[in-house]
Amino acid sequence: MRIDFTPDPKLYPFQSRWFDSSQGRIHYIDEGDGPPILLCHGNPTWSFLYRDIVIALRDRFRCVAPDYLGFGLSERPEGFGYKIDEHARIVGEFVDYLGLDGYLTMGQDWGGPIGMSVAVERADRVRSVVLGNTWFWPTDVLTTKIFSRVMSSPPMQWAILQRNFFVEQLIPAGTERRPSAVVMEHYRAVQPSPAARLGVAEMPKQLLAARPLLERLGREVPAKLGAKPALFVWGMKDVAFRPGPSLPRMRATFPDHVVVELPKAKHFIQEDAPDEIAAAIIERFG
């Protein structure tokens, strides 16, 4: 399945590009010159989430933002499982296809584990790490386990697939101010049917099902990436990734770090504080 939607060029003033991965066609943007920065989104978003950050950075950085299979304008290939390790494998193919070297990797939400999984396999090509409201280790937080089990239940899977629950409910809940109607339409239009939303529905299951991958990342990220310079940009009003439980492990993993607190931002920090994030990246790595 392919997605028939053309983003508003006033909001998303980028050229769409395509990569034929081993499992399906990937949509991405590749804007600007300079050190490459790989921008990894989470659930249920796509490269559109990074639009304002890309606009702010593309004079200094080469901004590369893919849509995972099952997300954004990328294909929904029949038979693809949408597991986190599968997404990471495809993003790894994409990074190799572009020949990214000396790159910054940024991840938010599931973009953390996916980006880190790609990075540990290519540590010699990674320049630095930017993480925001994410994680890369097995979760033992009770509320996260409950969220995974509830969202994996038949009634909530029905709501995700049939009613587009993650887009309609969790994006507004995860932003400090509800996004405008036209912004919401850009998230809604790329998930137009139950068949298009299989990737969105799988990700909450992966909070528990991807534990073997997260256990491996919990070991390999410190060992292979821990010496890299890091930047943490954190939405302080996020109820999913509260700074108290999350930031101490981030700090311990990356001793050479800078923390930028985003006091008004909730989970979707790229919507709530794009200018602050871009400024922090420029100050730290520009």
Residue ranges of model-derived segments:
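Alpha/beta-hydrolase fold catalytic core
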Residues: 1-37, 58-61, 96, 100-101, ...
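Acidic beta-to-alpha connecting loop that harbors the catalytic carboxylate
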Residues: 33, 236-239, 264-266
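Catalytic histidine-centered segment of alpha/beta-hydrolase-like enzymes
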Residues: 265-274, 278
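Conserved hydrolase catalytic core segment
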Residues: 101-142
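Conserved HGGG/HGGXW glycine-rich cap/lid loop of the alpha/beta-hydrolase fold
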Residues: 29-73
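Helix-rich cap/lid subdomain of alpha/beta-hydrolase
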Residues: 139-202
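Conserved serine/cysteine hydrolase catalytic core
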Residues: 196-252
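Active-site loop/oxyanion-hole signature of alpha/beta-hydrolase fold enzymes
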Residues: 19-23, 29-31, 65-107, 279
